[in-house]
Amino acid sequence: MSLLWLLSIGGTANATDWYYVGPDASGNQLFIDNDSVQKSDYDALLWLRVNELGGDELRYKVYISRYNRTMETLKVDAYMADGTPYENVEYNENPEPIEGNTNGQAIYNLLWQ
């Protein structure tokens, strides 16, 4: 699967099939947009929603490399509690390792185990 093709997948404004992942260390609730998941034997691209305790919602476009066991944030869309968007950020950072008992590990396990 071409990374360029994966990066072309659109946003999540109309996402309706959110799968609950669990809480993060801060108590925020994490969900995967099932409709956005593009997965192969080697990698995956998906949208991850984080409902913060204060009511704001963050949506992360993430790329996961299965065999490198890394996760990379490509984009973040932030919304206020009333749904008003307040920030859209494109990222160009190095992938981070997926380790231990983390959200990245939970998502990795949902995708490939």
Show the residue positions of the predicted features:
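N-terminal secretory-pathway/extracellular module detecting exported/lumenal segments
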Residues: G11-Q113
